[in-house]
Amino acid sequence: YVVVSTDYRTQLKDIDKSEYSDLQGFSSALQQAITCAVEDFGDATNYIIEHSVEWQINPAQIIACGSSAGAITALQAEYEICNQTAFADRLPANFNYAGVISFSGAICANGIPKWIMSPCPLMLFHGDADSTVPFTKAVVEEEMGLWGSNFICMQLKEKETAYYFYIAEGIGHSLSYSPMKDN
């Protein structure tokens, strides 16, 4: 096995909070932060693919994994690939992850998320008492919002797509870091 840990720009930490003191400003800052993280993640994925022969990596076996903001990044990248957005152009044609593992993640979308293509198999873990990343959804402005693991899995079930969903009852955002810390 080969494990690669990627880094990405964390825009919200670097922005003056006064820039997103209202809902519209926050919505814009959130979308920009997620876009930057996903772009960096895509570039890192592409770098891995470009060096796959040298590093003896099978690009068809790359699994994306993240927790909290990293889970949002991994899920959003898969969502962008499935919807053939400009993000997908950063990657080789027909590339998709072999799977995505998400600890307390969500997808950012304008309106209810729509999947043009079915996603790769997803494994999601989320506490139903999470007040940081929504378990189901958090509409930020009009229809733009974060659509959490519970909502995503309802869609995957309807699409009859491969997924596993572990609901940690009564657990908050600690599920985003406890598997890495406690195991």
PLM feature spans:
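Primarily recognizes the serine-hydrolase "nucleophile elbow" in alpha/beta-hydrolase
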Residues: 39, 43-118
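Active-site loop signature of alpha/beta-hydrolase-fold enzymes
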Residues: 11-13, 108, 131-132, 173-174
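The feature captures the conserved acid-bearing segment of alpha/beta-hydrolase catalytic domains
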Residues: 88-160
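Gram-negative outer-membrane beta-barrel domains
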Residues: 5, 55, 67-69, 150-155
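Short, solvent-exposed loop/turn and secondary-structure capping segments
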Residues: 15-17, 75-77, 112-115, 134-136, ...
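Structural recognition of the beta-strand scaffold that forms the well-ordered cores
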Residues: 2-7, 61-65, 98-103, 121-126, ...
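C-terminal catalytic histidine-bearing segment of alpha/beta-hydrolase fold enzymes
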Residues: 157-183
